[in-house]
Amino acid sequence: MTPWTRRRFLGEASCSALSGVAVLNTLLNLKLAERASAQGAPNDYKTLVCLFLNGGNDSFNWLVPRDAGRHAVYATARGNLALGVGDLLALNQTPEGDGQLYGIHPSCAGLQELFNGLGGDAGKRRAAFVANVGTLIQPTTKAQYLAESVPLPRALFSHSDQIDQWQTSVPQGMSELTGWGGRAADVLHASANTGQTAMGISLAGNNLFQVGSTVRQFVITADGALTLAGANTDAASDPLNPLRLKNAAQKSLLEQHYAGLMAESFAQLTKTSLDAQEFFLSQFNSYDDSAVAGLFPGGNFLARQFRAAAKAIALRPQLGLKRQTLFLSYGGWDHHSE
């Protein structure tokens, strides 16, 4: 497929007077709004689970060519990090692969089963690779980079900026303050969801991916919703719990009206967050998670995140969610110290 030039994209979109960032956001939001308007309130449920690999996954040793010619090119480029053909887990050929042979890292047996349709998902291909994708504005050679003859992302090679670019889908600049998951929630949340829980739930702290112009992300942990220090949701129903008066005092302060706009906004935001936290935690703690406990065995950080995500998905009727994004993260994916 012939790559689109920036000029061609702007011209064919009839938006040549707009910047690249404005065009991107406008087109994506218009498309989402068009579909949401046409479909009305959805009757089905869909969620997007984003596992963000902090540090940069070494994808050159994840998906590797197995045919002799291309493997030789790969081995030359990787040096002593290269994997032998015999070490790779073979992937079945696909119509999209043009007959080329690939394998994956020997530690990824589960991914091989998902791709090839083996194991518990026999006959169902549940994994795909989207290759040659990055934060460049357009395909760029080393010579073009050195000559600065093509548009380049700002702060190229800066890990923190590239994280922002992945999560905003805007490589052209660092001024975009919303993520593409958040922009989707701006359009979809009000029409698809009825509960007080946010469409975007994060198990990895605050992130740019779920930040929207009008919506907020809801941050939880593997054990449920975050609470204020010393707060206890069980105290409200227990007259003998010493935290009951403390909780009541906190809510009373938040329900006051303040003259200052900042103080009033902070109080309202905090109260809304606490109400959402209490509701979510009551549902989360009362859910029988035996059905999801075996899906992600182990006590490691990633398994605990996935179990909590599975519980959040299972609670969708109680939370009033038909469209949802879940954000998880896992780090340590680089060779800087090796």
Language model regions located:
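Feature for exported/extracytoplasmic and membrane-associated proteins, marking the mature portion
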Residues: M1-E338
